[in-house]
Amino acid sequence: MQHLFEKLFRAESMSQEESQQLFAAIVRGELEPSQLAAVLISMKVRGETPAEIAGAAQALLADAQHFPRPDYLFADIVGTGGDGTNSINISTASAFVAASCGVKVAKHGNRSVSSRSGSSDLLAAFGIRLDMSAEQSRLALDDLGVCFLFAPQYHTGFRHAMPVRQQLKTRTLFNVLGPLINPARPPLALIGVYSPELVLPIAQTLKVLGYQRAAVVHGGGMDEVAIHAPTQVAELNNGSIESYQLTPEDFGLNRYPLAALQGGMPEENRDILARLLQGKGETAHAAAVAANVALLLKLYGQENLRHNAQQALEMIHSGQAFDRVTALAARG
């Protein structure tokens, strides 16, 4: 391990295999806190490479609790969090709407990073159990088209890094790993990142990890497809990556100010999204979810974003998406 430390302290990049070896030791709790802090900061200052990020993700996936991976096509829709906008839980709502549109979503998530309510906080407020077994979650995915995988339940090795991360009080590689370590290992993913500089590197990382099709997005300060500003996209499709920009108009949607998407505490967000998913919500909220669902559906081969957004809006207005929330809660 010492040779890897010395390599990092010379500001040299690790290979994918070296990164996997190092992070396997981290999740086993084999590094001293001072060593872990030095590793994370040296990588941060130099800038983590896609190979290093992929190696770290592979180490955490190898250490994760097993999930019975389905053989049908399914996706994740998830953000890094930490964008500081304190918005409503767009990706969580989008998962239920996408399932209503007929696709399968295994959403990986955690407690809040920067907002007052992360996806897990919101689901708990809806009465959805965070500690469902992997088998129960797989059945929900089969039957309802949506399940939620609570990161700490599958990634116990994360706890070894937590004290150091809390003391450092700065973003490190761990802040981008969450969306890359879904234990169900989906072949498709829509991933939001907190910084535009991460869009292409994370898409390159998804290529290394073997994703079939994926889109990495950052929109006007948000780790989502935005309806207040252009969204930067890097789309991976069978090994090739295309970078482009999307505007709300590309989805046939109106623009709304970022302030229209302000969220609150988990109970407030629950009430906002309950109204939305029952077809009684704010038009800005519906548009934000429709844009994200539309891009997710594109990953399934539905290439027309305007048509996809319209399909999502119809599902939102029908109230069918909320039926999946109550059905998932009833499985507790």
Curated annotation (Swiss-Prot):
Cofactor note: Binds 2 magnesium ions per monomer.
Keywords recorded for this protein, A-Z: Amino-acid biosynthesis, Aromatic amino acid biosynthesis, Glycosyltransferase, Magnesium, Metal-binding, Transferase, Tryptophan biosynthesis
Any Pfam family matching the protein: Glycos_trans_3N
GO cellular component assignments: cytosol
Residues that bind Mg(2+) 1: S91, E224
Transmembrane found in the keyword field: no
Residues binding 5-phospho-alpha-D-ribose 1-diphosphate: 79, 82-83, 87, 89-92, 107-115, 119
Cofactor: Mg(2+)
Binding-site list for anthranilate 1: G79, N110
Catalytic activity: N-(5-phospho-beta-D-ribosyl)anthranilate + diphosphate = 5-phospho-alpha-D-ribose 1-diphosphate + anthranilate
GO terms under biological process: L-tryptophan biosynthetic process
InterPro entries listed in its UniProt record: Anthranilate_Pribosyl_Tfrase, Glycosyl_Trfase_fam3, Glycosyl_Trfase_fam3_N_dom, Glycosyl_Trfase_fam3_N_dom_sf, Nuc_phospho_transferase
Residues that hold Mg(2+) 2 according to the record: D223, E224
Biological pathway: Amino-acid biosynthesis; L-tryptophan biosynthesis; L-tryptophan from chorismate: step 2/5
GO MF terms held by the record: anthranilate phosphoribosyltransferase activity; magnesium ion binding
Amino-acid positions noted as binding anthranilate 2 in the UniProt annotation, renumbered to this chain: R165
Superkingdom of source: Bacteria
EC number: 2.4.2.18
Family: Belongs to the anthranilate phosphoribosyltransferase family.
Quaternary structure (record): Homodimer.
Function in brief: Catalyzes the transfer of the phosphoribosyl group of 5-phosphorylribose-1-pyrophosphate (PRPP) to anthranilate to yield N-(5'-phosphoribosyl)-anthranilate (PRA).
Protein name: Anthranilate phosphoribosyltransferase
